[in-house]
Amino acid sequence: MSTVLTALHEALDSAPEQDMTTRLDQSWLLGFDTETTGTSPNRDNIVSASLVLRNPRTGYEGDAVAEWIINPGRHISEGASRVNGFTDEYLAENGSEPAESIEQIAGLIMTAQSKHIPLLAYNAPFDVRMLNGDIRQWCSGGMEPMPEKELLVVDPLVIDRAISHRSGRRTLTYTTEYYGVVPHGDFHDATTDTVASVDLIEPMTTLYPQVGSITLGELMDWQRDAHRTWLKQFNEWLTSKGSRPAIDTWF
């Protein structure tokens, strides 16, 4: 086991088991992001992933971080390669064996879940479903996919749509700029994206105290309601343009 992976294990083991009355602005968080061969769970694969454990008392300086480079043994699409910079040749030379890496990532996430430490990801369904697709492909003998409907998740994209009524795009790049979050590196690097996503919670909960006061026990219902409200408005707009309504894909 690598030194950084050991450090994350130790930090997670020493983290407290949180009560469900813990407020979001006082909660430990486990940030998660992936880079992939494409955008289709069950067809594409993860090539890079990062987990970042954030202690609310120490912030960025106290983060425990682990990153994986994974060789799925398949072609990465040109579009994905342009976005994340990975090539087939680089992954073949530097990537780890998929099953072990995917088991490590999922195991750490479920350890955090057992302590009521939310999994934080920007547009969380994508990363969770990519991971579950890889669990099904690589770990069918020893690990079940994560129970998506039972996960405790923080999705800054869902929160932002509920509290900020600005116009324009809501990619991670634009959203961090809006909230004054400066990335620690280049976007579309899994660790940079993970840290930036976690960093969003402080300005969001400071600017909107009603978000900071959401308890872990209230968190999923609040986000589901917020997503349904946004989706209804978005589909009304799509319909007015003659487009087909979007399907609900949140947890």
Where are the model-predicted features located?
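DEDD superfamily 3′-5′ metal-dependent exonuclease/proofreading module
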Residues: 1-47, 54-64, 92-251
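Short, surface-exposed acidic-centric catalytic microdomains
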Residues: 64-84
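A generic alpha-helix surface/boundary motif
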Residues: 74-75, 85, 129, 170
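Short, structured active-site "lid" loops
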Residues: 83-94
